[in-house]
Amino acid sequence: MKAVIFAYHDMGCQGVQAVLDAGYEIAAIFTHADNPAENTFFGSVSRLAAGLGIPVYAPDNVNHPIWIDRIAELAPDIIFSFYYRNLLSEEILHLAPAGAFNLHGSLLPAYRGRAPLNWVLVNGESETGVTLHRMVKRADAGEIVASQRVAIAQDDVALTLHHKLCQAARQLLNSILPTMKCGDIPSVPQRESDATYYGRRRPEDGLIDWHKPVSTVHNLVRAVAAPWPGAFSYNGSQKFTIWSSRICPDAQGALPGSVISVSPLRVACADGALEIITGQAGDGITVQGSQLAQTLGLVAGARLNRPPATSGKRRIRVLILGVNGFIGNHLTERLLNEENYEVYGMDIGSNAISRFLLHPRFHFVEGDISIHSEWIEYHVKKCDVVLPLVAIATPIEYTRNPLRVFELDFEENLRIIRYCVKYRKRVVFPSTSEVYGMCTDASFDEDKSNLIVGPVNKPRWIYSVSKQLLDRVIWAYGEKEGLRFTLFRPFNWMGPRLDSLNAARIGSSRAITQLILNLVEGTPIKLIDGGQQKRCFTDIRDGIEALFRIIVNDGDRCDGKIINIGNPDNEASIQELATLLLDSFDKHPLRCHFPPFAGFQVVESRSYYGKGYQDVAHRKPSIDNARRCLGWEPSIAMRDTVEETLDFFLRSVDVAERAS
């Protein structure tokens, strides 16, 4: 039986070896590149695979159609996932006739999700285990094939329990894999009523609350002991980490967080005292408790505290889905420039946000909104403001993939809106200037202009009507269920990181990127229907400032409002945009590295976009709502925007590529 394996960590190594020992043919292994910021104390699946002579890959997005096609060419009979960190798309799961199976580090249906090893210790469980289950679209929700229980001893910490689970996993796989190889794969459904879900743990989750019971604090120490980041507290501004501890039942009447004694080092909790056996001050070395007390300058009666607060208010948590996109990455930068915002983000890639990945107030998970529904629901509940920015928003895709546009832009986003309703969270939703369609007004008014689209046989309008329908649903939820919302409608925002030249090469980019690609490659600039269509181009900096003010929502003035964000003064036809771009290109210092200008070429829209396309003559916003609600006025001239956008793309072109 031929297998394709997705694996990482020690469990991944155990799984690969067990599959080989059971006599399977492994066609390929998919793993992850190690993160330099992570403590990689565990075994390397890639080194194991290379040593065994098995092809091994570590794609950024294994769910990309290119990788799906490559896996299909391998023709696997069965798929295994052993601690692979990303969910697999349904397209991949359906490639193996015998099914796809995941090894999870808990006794399902309990502790679905991330970091079950740590969570069972945090919660003081006495038993856990490993489960092999069928993979379905929802994480850890498929039918159970086999499981093995593991007792948790009182002196177990994260690393010792990790070793126990690896041993149990190997035993489980050794017993079940030969049976599965013969085609006998019995499974039983999980009981949904018993399901629990836990999210990813972060280093900052190790902060100790001394007002908790001593058993809770001790369990936290066990759960994140080395090589995990550790449980920590503060003496003044000095951070220290506790690596091992024991419970003392008597707090001697001391207040929580008070140092009872320094030799041994004991700290009062809500109902007892924690004895600190070993610990570490700052980035120093690990020492025993009494030496730690001496290093920190602790005396009996001292009070430990939480980290020094930058302000009395909790930071506002903003959830951005599609955080790696054009708007998402620029908005993240604006929010992180303010001390009182924390950003949680998801996207299928991280190239545009790589500059934020180590920022302490930026929390990113690579994932797909159509797959990671439980993560999304958890973070909608956790955050204060939600921005669902994921959408297919390039015209050629409207005619090429109308059903996919509807599924993503409407159906997936509707689910997120319903989470916002359920947990009573404020949503800032990206409508679009496209909802106005072929409106005949000189400028489009959010509250008065008619929304006019073409006939059903023009799939070009699928994006417009998907967004419009969601606008109406959100409005109805506001009226009937009290949903707090603001709809914003961007008008042709431009700037650095708009999209990519590779996207332009397959026709799936914004207009200016396509024009820049023509200049870079020395191909004619294509003017669709002569390029007479007029748009109002808005600098990303102006747009993001307006969006930031919507999030701030001073005096709640944005609640229940629809706000156009565009620059009426920057109106130009596509032909005028192309001419301005060409002028800037000819003056650019890198101009000599690129081919000669190949001229303009007039192209009929039907031949470029397909028969389902229909264009709009003009699109100009009224920005009265933005002025009134935000005190906002765009200020950046179109030429400045064009020059900055062009400069970004030209400098992104590889030197060798320029020369060719």
Swiss-Prot record:
The record marks 140 as: Raises pKa of active site His. Keywords: Antibiotic resistance, Lipid A biosynthesis, Lipid biosynthesis, Lipid metabolism, Lipopolysaccharide biosynthesis, Multifunctional enzyme, NAD, Oxidoreductase, Transferase. Pfam families: Epimerase, Formyl_trans_C, Formyl_trans_N. Pathway: Nucleotide-sugar biosynthesis; UDP-4-deoxy-4-formamido-beta-L-arabinose biosynthesis; UDP-4-deoxy-4-formamido-beta-L-arabinose from UDP-alpha-D-glucuronate: step 1/3; Nucleotide-sugar biosynthesis; UDP-4-deoxy-4-formamido-beta-L-arabinose biosynthesis; UDP-4-deoxy-4-formamido-beta-L-arabinose from UDP-alpha-D-glucuronate: step 3/3; Bacterial outer membrane biogenesis; lipopolysaccharide biosynthesis. NAD(+) binds at residues 347, 368-369. Residues 314-660 are annotated as: Dehydrogenase ArnADH. It catalyses: UDP-alpha-D-glucuronate + NAD(+) = UDP-beta-L-threo-pentopyranos-4-ulose + CO2 + NADH; UDP-4-amino-4-deoxy-beta-L-arabinose + (6R)-10-formyltetrahydrofolate = UDP-4-deoxy-4-formamido-beta-L-arabinose + (6S)-5,6,7,8-tetrahydrofolate + H(+). This is Bifunctional polymyxin resistance protein ArnA. It comes from Salmonella heidelberg (strain SL476). The lineage of its organism: Bacteria, Pseudomonadati, Pseudomonadota, Gammaproteobacteria, Enterobacterales.
